Amino acid sequence: MAEIRRQPFQTVKVDIEEMDRKIREHRIRMLKRAGIVLGILILLWFLLYIYHQVRTYDSHEAKVTEDRQDSAANTYLEFQGNILKYSNDGAFYTDTSNELIWNQSYEMSDPVVVMSAKYAAIGDEKGTLVYIFDKDGLCGKIETTKPIVRVKIAEQGTVALLLEENGVSYLKLCDKTGKTLAEGELHVENSGYPMDIALSKDGKQFAVSMLDISDGTIKSSIAFYNFDSAGEKKIDHVVGTKKYSDIIIPQIEFLENDNLIAVSNQKLMLLEVSGKPQEKKSIKYGSRLRTFFYNGKYIGLILDNESSSKEEKNDVYCMQIYDNRGALVKEKTFSRTYRKAEFLNNNEVCLLNDNECTIFTLRGVEKYHEAWDKSIYKVLPGR
C-alpha cells in the first residue's frame, strides 16, 4: 500500500484535434447516409407518382352498392366531399354512405345549382326562388319579384342574379342570408341583350356579357362592375367595358385567379380585371368547338379533330387543356363518344356517355374506360 501511495498521479493527454476530426468524419458519414436514404425515398415517390399517372384501368370492383330509391329526375353533385341530390321538389345532402345530413323541400319548375367551395345555391330559372346552403344546411332564401335568368355564387356565399321581365333586364346581388346588397336595371337600348353574368371569387367583381344586333350587325360587349373601393366613384360601379365585333359571347366565368374567361363562337378570351379590364390572351379554336368546361384552375375545350398526323387523323375529337393563365397544358385527340365533359376534383377529365365512362389525366393518359350495364349519372372521385 505504501508503494502505491508513493506512485505519482498520472494524467492522460487527449488529442483534441484528433477527436474533432473523428466527430466531423462521423457527422459526414451520417449526412451521406441520410442523403442517400432521402434520395431513395424521393426516387420511390417519383416512380410511384409516374406509375399512378400512367397506370390504366378497364374494370372496377364494387365495395359498396346502394339501390336508388328515387327517380331518374334527381340530379347528383359533389359538395364538400359529400353528395348533394336535388330535383323539382327538394334537395338532400348525404354522406358517401348515403346517411342523411340535411334536406330541404321546395317547389321549382327548373332548378339549377351553382357552387363555390363552401356554399351552394339552388335557383329556379324562370321562377323567383333561390335557396343558399352550406354543409350544415340552409343559410338563406331569396325571393324575387321578377323571373330569374341566371344565378352565380361567390366563395363567401354572395349570390348574383340576372332577372328579366317584359324585355327589361335587372341585376341583383345578395349575401348568403338573402339580404339585398345591390340591384339595378340594365338599359338594353344602350348596351344590348344580356347573355350571361359572372361573379368573382370574393364577390366584389361582377361582369355581364351583352349582345347587340340593333343595327343589323353582331356586336358583343362585356361590362365590368366593381363593388369595392375601385368602383365607389364610378357610375353604377362600372369600371370598364370591352367591345367586340362579329362574335357572340354566350358564356363568361371568373377563374380562381380572378381573371375572366369569355367563351365566344370563334375564340376563347382571357381578360385581366384587377385594374382596367384588358385582354391578356386570345385562343382561336381552329375547328368547331363542341364542348367547354372548367373548374377555376383549368379550362377544357373539345373541338373537331383536324389533325393531319398519321397517328391522330382518324380520331374524331381534339381535347385542349389550358391553365388559368391561358397556357396550353395538354392536347389530346380521341374518338370516345361522350355527352358530357367535366373536371373531377382531382383535376382529371371525365367524359360520360349514357353507360360509358372515360377518364383522362392532365398528361393525356386515358386512365380509365369502361362500359357499364346501367346508365351513369355522375362520377365522383374517391377519398
Predicted regions and their residues:
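N-terminal Lys/Arg-rich, disordered targeting/topogenic segments
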Residues: M1-L31
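Hydrophobic membrane-insertion alpha-helices, especially the h-region
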Residues: K32-Y49
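A short beta-strand motif characteristic of beta-propeller blades
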Residues: R55-R68, N98-S105, D136-E143, T180-H187, ...
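Repeated scaffold domains used in trafficking and secretory/extracellular systems
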Residues: R68-E78, E107-K118, K146-G157, N190-L199, ...
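Short beta-strand elements that form the blades of beta-propeller/WD-repeat-like
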Residues: N74-S87, A91-F92, V113-E125, V130-Y131, ...
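Short loop/turn segments that connect beta-strands within beta-propeller blades
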Residues: D95-S97, D134-G137, C174-K179, F227-A230, ...
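Structured, soluble extracytoplasmic/luminal domains of envelope-associated proteins
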Residues: I101-E155, Q278-E306, Y317-C318, L328-T333
